Amino acid sequence: MKLRTDDYSASQDSMLLGMRSMSKWILDAMAIDRICMRNRVAMDIWNEYSPLPYQTNFNSRSGTIGRFVEMYINNQYKGIYCLSDRINRKLLNLKKYDETNKLVRGVLYKSGTEDIANQKERNFTADWKAGTISWHNAWELKEPEDFECEEAWQPLIDLYDNKKSYSDIKKYFFIDNLVDYQLHIMALSIGDNWGNKNHFLSIRNIQKNIDDADSTEAARRKAIISPWDLDTSLGGKYNGSAYDGNGYSDWKPADVVKNGGCYPFSICQGQKEYKNKLKARWAQLRTTTYSKESVNAKLEKYRDLFLNSGAWQRMVDHYKTESSKPCLVEDLTKEIGYIEEWYAKRFDLMDAYFGIDTGIATTTTDNQSLNNDIYSIQGLKLNEAPAKGLYIQGGKLRMK
């Protein structure tokens, strides 16, 4: 959505619903998300725990914020939409293009696009707004805006062509940012965001020297990954087929690691330091942002907003009479309950993958080692480990 002046001659920045002033906004129809909040909840989670590693005018936020609205177009009701800001130069504090010297400084790339037809080999559109870096690895150039050029693509090309070791990744990326992004994928099972699509890559100023003796200056040349389009999170599917207790994503945390993901994550998998960072970060976040209580609270906040305002019922009633309709559920409370059950199991799978000590202990009166005692997740002692599923042994949650 673009805001214009009254005579439509120019763009018009404006604050909407308490969000930062912009001329271009996102109106998300959430057409494949049956609860109309997955992207918003997942982005709220990201913003809560993963700030940019530098200061900005927006509290170092790298994800969008949004407000839910009921949409009317030419007096025709369209249901619930999410109005949100964009990931852009101002949000990420990227250095603006130098028009005087015609110099590219800050760059922002968006992964995944249909704007370029040939995605089998490296090529670019004539206006330099989109390009394919490698086989089925297409990007859009979002910054510099209005000054797209070949020079702006060189940093991305250089990363893919020449920075292929783990030491390179540590030098050219913020490892903690990569760890946070991978945990987001693992914890919320966001399979649609682990390949060559649905994320941003930004560099504050490509004119800076990555080898500068001043680490603050060198950091301005490092790349940041920001998430985008998270509507397959929390058990969701790309076609809206997961609902009513059935069909939710069963992509296990271990599968995320085995898959490897796209560059630069594919290079990090298997690195001891990186694995240790993932485990330590999960151990920290499982009691805060990713706790069952915290995730449930975010789901229930938007559930209550939709129900108490009457917006959900209005949307359900409206689309009952329409031939073309988005994916919806009539009973939102019931569906949120199913998703909370899904996340409770996902949380336990994350604990099992990382070998997190649950704090469950037993007292024995014989000489049998505690490590040989096996319990169900309900606390019942078992004679042997189950053939499949979760169980507790030696105070640790395990999985077969």
Regions flagged by a language model, labelled:
Residues 38, 42, 48:
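Phosphate/pyrophosphate-binding loops and the adjoining catalytic core of nucleotide-dependent enzymes
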Residues 55-77, 197, 209, 213-218:
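Accessory structured domains or lobes within enzymes
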Residues 390-400:
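C-terminal tail/sorting-segment detector
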